[in-house]
Structures are given as structure tokens and as C-alpha cells.
Amino acid sequence: MSPELYNIFYESHRGSWAILIILFLVSYFLIKAGKGKAGKILHMIVRLFFVIMLITGAGMLVYWQFAFLFIVKGVLAIVLIYAMEMLLTRTSKGTIGQQARIYWIVFITCLVLVALIGYNVISF
């Protein structure tokens, strides 16, 4: 893979994460406020960004030849995506209950770890 292609994946990945987190939070609070239709539209856009994250992340994983640290980051990112999806889906259905606290803890923990690994603060 050429460095130019890697740069495209990297910039798309990094910028899309910021947009994804903002859209996720807006969608969540719209759903909590009872504005279901607007929340559902944003939820669909969030799902599109999930796909973008997975494709660009896989491209970068290939570039780095499946280094262990980036495999760990990928697994954490998938858990993060799962937590975001469960928070949005179960909140909109009204079935989140006591599990909301657990999903928020998983969301925040994975988000911090993925960001720290992504910006090379954590490395091994």
C-alpha cells in the first residue's frame, strides 16, 4: 500500500471519529428528549460512519501489517461501536433500564483507550 493511500485512510479515519462522536451524542440526546424522528435520522447517519470507521480502520490495519497494538485498538473500537449502538437502540426502544450505566462506562473507557492508542500515547 502506498503512503498516499495510507494518508487517505488515516485522515478519513481520524476526521470521521470526531464527527461520529458528535453525531452520536446529538442523536442520543434527541432520543432522550423525545424527538424520535430526528434521533432516528441521525442514528442512521451514525451507522454510516460506523461503516466508514470499519473500512478505513481495516485499511490502516493492513498497512501496519496487523501489528498487535492495532489489532487491540480494532477490537476496542468494535466494542465502542457496540456500546454506541446499544445506547441508541435500547434508549429509543425504552429497554435500556439499569444497563445504561454499564454501557456508558464501556463507551467512555473504550473511547479513551482508542483515542490514546490512536494518538500514540499508549504503545507497547
Swiss-Prot record:
The record's subcellular location field reads: Cell membrane
The portions of this protein that span the membrane are: 15-35, 40-60, 61-81, 102-122
Provide this UniProt record's keywords sorted from A to Z. Answer: Cell membrane, Membrane, Transmembrane, Transmembrane helix
Give the UniProt entry's GO cellular component terms.
plasma membrane
Q: Name one Pfam family in it.
A: DUF1516
Predominant location of this chain?
membrane
Instruction: Tell me how this protein sits in the membrane.
Output: Multi-pass membrane protein
Q: Which family does it belong to?
A: Belongs to the UPF0344 family.
Q: Which NCBIfam families match?
A: PRK13673.1-5 (NF010198)
Q: HAMAP family attached here?
A: UPF0344
Q: What protein name does the entry list?
A: UPF0344 protein BH2983
Organism, scientific name: Halalkalibacterium halodurans (strain ATCC BAA-125 / DSM 18197 / FERM 7344 / JCM 9153 / C-125)
